Amino acid sequence: MAPITVGDVVPDGTISFFDENDQLQTVSVHSIAAGKKVILFGVPGAFTPTCSMSHVPGFIGKAEELKSKGIDEIICFSVNDPFVMKAWGKTYPENKHVKFVADGSGEYTHLLGLELDLKDKGLGIRSRRFALLLDNLKVTVANVESGGEFTVSSAEDILKAL
């Protein structure tokens, strides 16, 4: 499947997360992104070094600025189960705006065309690192990394595009 790109409508599919009442929710992407400006940023794995020390902290640190520029939701996405994503989210006590969601089976990652084969590293099929800006489901920015790089998908890169 070809990777998602600018101008595409983000595919519908399901993601899972724990809500503020600690209840597991499985929802369609369209239900949380329709009519909104949403940043969906993907990482290869929870608790991995670049994701934990650079990518996620960047979005947490810039969340207020992103929201001031009209962003309604900031969603961190990974091919992990929702329990792992919940635990990972708790490692950022300063976080007030980034929602940690799971694509447990990797099906949504496949719909996006953003799979990354990390079997040689013992991680299986994961998500490429990326940052998408969605405006009422339409992709207006698609910053997708090659391999395990972290050069175009930061919060700063999204801010520059706003």
Curated annotation (Swiss-Prot):
One of its GO terms (biological process) is cellular response to oxidative stress. Residues 4-162 form the Thioredoxin domain. Its EC number is 1.11.1.25. It catalyses: [glutaredoxin]-dithiol + a hydroperoxide = [glutaredoxin]-disulfide + an alcohol + H2O. The active site is at 51 (cysteine sulfenic acid (-soh) intermediate). Keywords: Antioxidant, Cytoplasm, Oxidoreductase, Peroxidase, Redox-active center. One of its GO terms (cellular component) is cytoplasm. Pfam families: Redoxin (PF08534). It is an enzyme of class 1 (oxidoreductase). It is found in: Cytoplasm. The keyword Lipoprotein does not apply. Its main location: cytoplasm. It comes from the Eukaryota. GO terms for molecular function: thioredoxin peroxidase activity. Induction: Highly induced by salt or oxidative stresses. Gene3D superfamilies: Glutaredoxin. PANTHER family: PEROXIREDOXIN, PEROXIREDOXIN-2A-RELATED. Belongs to the peroxiredoxin family. Prx5 subfamily. The active site is a conserved redox-active cysteine residue, the peroxidatic cysteine (C(P)), which makes the nucleophilic attack on the peroxide substrate. The peroxide oxidizes the C(P)-SH to cysteine sulfenic acid (C(P)-SOH), which then reacts with another cysteine residue, the resolving cysteine (C(R)), to form a disulfide bridge. The disulfide is subsequently reduced by an appropriate electron donor to complete the catalytic cycle. In this 1-Cys peroxiredoxin, no C(R) is present and C(P) instead forms a disulfide with a cysteine from another protein or with a small thiol molecule. Monomer. Thiol-specific peroxidase that catalyzes the reduction of hydrogen peroxide and organic hydroperoxides to water and alcohols, respectively. Plays a role in cell protection against oxidative stress by detoxifying peroxides and as sensor of hydrogen peroxide-mediated signaling events. This is Peroxiredoxin-2C. It comes from Arabidopsis thaliana (Mouse-ear cress). The gene is PRXIIC.
